[in-house]
């Protein structure tokens, strides 16, 4: 939606709109570090009543960051560059599309 939940980016105004929130099927939070992930997840949950289906971004650049997010926030965390397929699978599952399309093997 934008470049930040806070500030002049307008994401907060979008998420404040109940009609838009009700149309969301999945939200992936990208965070720079575990503290930003914590704050982003907290804002999404408490202010906007949105449960993120995953966290990605530089906060997931190492196993420690991934573990902190998963354990402290109880949200799946994946590095999109090194574990993109798992992130995709997580989102597909979260939005209810798992098993609805045939899996095509790569050539």
Where are each of the predicted segments found?
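C-terminal helix of von Willebrand factor
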Residues: 83-103
């Amino acid at each position: 939606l934008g470049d930040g939940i806070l500030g002049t980016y307008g994401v907060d105004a979008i998420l404040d709109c109940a009609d838009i929130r009700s149309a969301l099927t999945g939200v992936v939070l990208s965070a720079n570090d575990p503290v930003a992930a914590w704050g982003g997840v907290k804002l999404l949950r408490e202010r906007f009543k949105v449960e993120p289906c995953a966290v990605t971004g530089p906060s997931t650049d190492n196993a420690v960051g991934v573990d902190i997010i998963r354990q402290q926030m109880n949200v799946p965390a994946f590095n999109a560059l090194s574990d993109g397929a798992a992130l995709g699978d997580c989102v597909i599952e979260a939005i209810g599309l798992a098993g609805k399309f045939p899996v095509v093997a790569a050539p």
